[in-house]
């Protein structure tokens, strides 16, 4: 799934089988790329993401990844995010990489379980970085915690 160069009011990841029948399994098997977009809301819906989700060079008012199992990992680079929630999810088999971003609002990792590296570098958090303790509790091994704020 690829969304590039433009404005989208609402992006959500819907699940269906090969015949287009509605939600049989909530496993998305393809990579997701959101690039050079301006979007009001990106909502992952509760689901399982086998491949990497990548957001780059974008502006997103609300990035809501509630109960998203991001097995393939997540990369957010060179973007401005209003509100970001990765809550009650995680379970990443691949790294979560957040680099060169500006976060305008709350950042929420509450109740996530992180099973691989989480790398946060060169980001600005206008509402502070209280969420760092949530990440520290979420990582399954201390060496996965690679946050430089």
Stretches found by the model and what they are:
Residues 1-149:
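N-terminal leader/targeting and pre-domain segments
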């Amino acid at each position: 799934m690829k969304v590039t160069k433009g404005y989208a009011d609402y992006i959500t990841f819907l699940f269906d089988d090969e015949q287009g029948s509605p939600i049989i399994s909530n496993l998305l098997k393809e990579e997701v790329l959101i690039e050079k977009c301006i979007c009001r809301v990106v909502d992952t819906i509760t689901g399982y993401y086998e491949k990497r989700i990548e957001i780059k060079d974008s502006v997103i008012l609300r990035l809501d990844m509630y109960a998203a199992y991001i097995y393939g990992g997540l990369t957010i680079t060179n973007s401005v995010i209003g509100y970001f929630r990765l809550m009650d999810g995680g379970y990443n088999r691949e790294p979560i990489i957040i680099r060169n971003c500006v976060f305008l609002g709350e950042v929420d990792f509450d109740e996530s379980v992180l099973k691989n590296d989480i790398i946060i570098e060169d980001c600005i958090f206008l509402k502070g970085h209280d969420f760092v303790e949530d990440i520290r509790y979420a990582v399954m091994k201390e060496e996965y915690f690679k946050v430089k704020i």
